[in-house]
UniProtKB/Swiss-Prot annotation:
Protein name: Small ribosomal subunit protein uS19
Coiled-coil intervals, chain numbering: none
Keyword Ribonucleoprotein attributed: yes
Cross-referenced PROSITE patterns: RIBOSOMAL_S19
PANTHER family: RIBOSOMAL PROTEIN S19P FAMILY MEMBER, SMALL RIBOSOMAL SUBUNIT PROTEIN US19M
Encoding gene, per UniProt annotation: rpsS
Species, as recorded: Dechloromonas aromatica (strain RCB)
NCBIfam families registered for this protein in UniProt: rpsS_bact (TIGR01050)
């Protein structure tokens, strides 16, 4: 179930402050954040946000198609190594 429209999208206040500061100075460095739960807003388009995945910060370049999604969706936390081949059962 989605979030109520009357509440609006959730974005951490410190992330909004960082985005506004970068927009004012037109700095090209990635914005480092641990806030995977924040929703991507139209103001983020064209910025690179380094999202923490539990081990390191993954750079995410925000495009138009990402608006409305959460930052955590683009920084995977698990690596799939693949299933082992396994031995076939002997008859």
């Amino acid at each position: 179930m989605g979030r109520s429209l009357k509440k609006g999208p959730f974005v951490d206040a410190h992330l909004i402050d960082k985005v506004e500061a970068v927009r004012a100075t037109s700095d090209k460095r990635p914005i480092k954040t641990w806030s995977r739960r924040s929703t991507i807003l139209p103001e983020f388009i064209g910025l690179t946000i380094a999202v923490h995945n539990g081990k390191q910060h993954i750079p995410v370049f925000v495009t138009e198609n990402m608006v409305g999604h959460k930052l955590g969706e683009f920084s995977l936390t698990r690596t799939f190594k693949g299933h082992t081949a396994g031995k076939k059962a002997k008859k």
